Curated annotation (Swiss-Prot):
Gene Ontology terms, MF aspect: heme binding; iron ion binding; monooxygenase activity; oxidoreductase activity, acting on paired donors, with incorporation or reduction of molecular oxygen
Keywords annotated in UniProt: Heme, Iron, Membrane, Metal-binding, Monooxygenase, Oxidoreductase, Transmembrane, Transmembrane helix
Taxonomy, superkingdom: Eukaryota
Residue numbers binding heme: C489
Practical applications: Aspergilol A shows a weak cytotoxicity toward MCF-7, MDA-MB231, and HepG2 cancer cells lines, with an IC(50) value ranging from 21.21 to 48.76 uM; whereas aspergilol B only shows a weak cytotoxicity against MCF-7 cells, with an IC(50) value of 27.41 uM. None of the aspergilols have antifungal or antibacterial activities.
E.C. number: 1.-.-.-
Gene name for this UniProt entry: AuAP450
This protein's name: Aspergilol synthase AuAP450
Length: 548
């Protein structure tokens, strides 16, 4: 007796064949089953495809894979650039520009893999800029992106709103008090570092920028005593200038679960540097607190610096603990010192390259005229009248948009964020706008590759830029390099005034040129996601004849 079951096509299948059956009979049935096997395979594949059709969309509910991707081949980039090491570190900006032309100009987003942060970044078209402008940190957060990108918890602790308050409220709210200090410190450091050489004297562009910005910004952030303390200055400089290098180290490679343990070990030296700098700050805070109890810091005697402003804030006592204040101020020292250094290098290169002959004479004449109205002081009022100098700076930032050619970085904090019916991104997504591409778009800025120092001078303040492709008004974004909207760089007003004072004084005091003879403006170095100025550039300074 044989036992049968009905097969998938209605045929009987012999599960327990009777061993007494003739061998030829069993062979005949096996042959019949083999003929049915293609039908069985086709049916199985059809069922799997049908299941995949229904199940796969649930893994991509926001249709992220439908957002076009711009890929970067290491081999192809090494071939295109003609530089072998691009196989290891492929360029970033050319591919952002490729995506901008292909998608952004058609109001479509695209995505690119950011190897330094091991994340997909969604590059948004300009039409979404007004929507992002006024979003709060509970929806779209710059602060949380910075915290995640820099791995701040590995060195000095996570960022919070205090750092933003220091820039947006304390620095900006005290600009009138800050300006005289900035001017005095600038004059001191120029005399100390450059002096008044009658013959050409050589300086490295980065070393000079570090010395000048450090001397001025350290005074604003940490007070006169610490700004003139060599031990503190050394620790503060090492900490603030290493934030970005420590942020990027090892991030380019996917190390899996070993990534954070290795980063923690690498940040050990940074934590040690932070501890040294912190001791100086906490000792100063303790001294000031003691004087306050003795009523010796009243009225005009109160120091003008970020330490004192932080101590005076109406915040919980635990947030005003000396170590907490020190850590937060050292956090923002990277923004107050490192960021202006990069900007100073870029603008200084533009001054040497483009502010020549009559252009330089025109800028100098305007500065002299405006300062003369205010007894030689770089005040808010005198700087407001320097329209041509302001236009030169705006054009410089248009051509070289700071350290990163992208702006408006946000981490989506809500469960999801709906930009419109075509674009919804989930929590944890990173968005950004292609600043450099926007500012070099010929449909927005005519002749974008030409440095026109009067470009913004000719623009009326009430007019909007117009996109030549669509005829639509484009949101004003002359300073887009500093971000946009509520979460733009809170220290941008301070930074712009700082740079104008330093570089304006340099133009009045010195003739400046590239060492070794005339040359084109040094190109930027593409180090994903950074466009860095060439730190090897050498300059030469000579005091002007009319400077006494």
């Amino acid at each position: 007796m044989d036992i049968y079951v009905v097969g998938p096509f209605g045929h009987a299948m012999d599960l327990l064949p009777n061993p007494t059956r003739p061998f030829s009979g069993r062979l005949h049935e096996l042959s019949a089953l083999a003929l049915q096997r293609p039908q069985l395979v086709i049916t199985t594949l059809g069922a799997l495809l049908l299941a995949a059709f229904y199940l796969l969309p649930s893994k991509d509910p926001y249709n992220l894979k439908r957002i076009p991707m711009v890929s970067r081949s290491r081999v192809l980039d090494a071939y295109r650039s003609g530089v072998w090491w691009r196989f290891i570190l492929p360029r970033f900006y050319p591919y952002i520009h490729e995506g901008y032309l292909k998608y952004s100009t058609k109001d479509r987003p695209f995505r690119v893999w950011l190897a330094q942060f091991q994340i997909w970044v969604y590059i948004l078209p300009l039409k979404y800029l007004p929507l992002v402008k006024n979003q709060g940190i509970t929806e779209l957060s710059l602060r949380d992106f910075i915290d995640k990108a820099t791995s701040a918890q590995l060195s000095s602790g996570s960022f919070d709103t205090f750092e933003v308050q220091v820039g947006s409220k304390l620095l900006n709210g005290n600009l009138i008090d800050i300006k005289p200090i900035v001017q005095t410190r600038t004059e001191q450091i120029l005399e100390r570092v450059i002096g008044r050489p009658r013959e050409w004297r050589r300086f490295n562009i980065r070393a000079l920028s570090v010395q000048v910005v450090k001397h001025v910004s350290a005074r604003i952030a940490f007070g006169e005593a610490l700004a003139d303390n060599p031990g503190f200055l050394d620790a503060m400089e090492r900490y603030s200038l290493n934030v970005i290098p420590y942020t990027l180290v090892f991030r380019y490679f996917n190390l899996g679960p070993l990534r954070y343990p290795l980063l923690y070990l690498i940040h050990l030296r940074q934590r040690q540097t932070l501890a040294v700098a912190t001791r100086y700050v906490t000792d100063l805070i303790a001294e000031r607190q003691r004087k306050e109890k003795e009523h010796r810091l009243d009225g005009d005697e109160r120091p003008v610096d970020c330490i004192q402003w932080s101590m005076d804030q109406d915040i919980p006592d635990e947030q005003k603990a000396p170590e907490a204040v020190a850590h937060r101020l050292l956090h923002i020292s990277a923004a107050l010192i490192d960021a202006p250094i990069t900007s100073m290098m870029n603008v200084l290169a533009d001054i040497i390259s483009y502010a020549r002959d009559e252009v330089l004479d025109d800028l100098r004449a305007e500065i002299v005229e405006c300062l003369a109205e205010f007894d030689g002081a770089w005040t808010e009022a005198s700087m407001a009248k320097m329209k041509k100098l302001d236009s030169f700076f705006q054009e410089s930032f248009r051509m070289t948009s700071g350290l990163i050619p992208l702006t408006g970085w946000r981490l989506i904090k809500a469960d999801c964020f709906r930009f419109d019916n075509d674009l919804v991104l989930p929590r944890g997504s990173t968005i950004v706008f292609p600043t450099q591409c926007i500012q070099l778009d010929p449909n927005i800025y005519p002749n974008p590759d030409k440095f026109d120092y009067l470009r913004f001078y000719r623009m009326k303040e009430h007019t909007q830029s117009t996109d030549a492709r669509t005829g639509k008004e484009v949101p004003r974004h002359e300073w887009l390099s500093f971000g946009h909207g509520r979460q733009a760089c809170p220290g941008r007003f301070y930074s712009i005034r700082l740079l104008k004072t330093i570089l304006g004084e340099m133009m009045l005091r010195y003739d400046i040129r590239y060492a070794g003879g005339d040359r084109p403006r040094p190109p930027m170095i593409d180090l994903e996601p950074i466009l860095a100025p060439d730190t090897s550039v050498e300059l030469e300074f000579r005091v002007r004849q009319n400077v006494t």
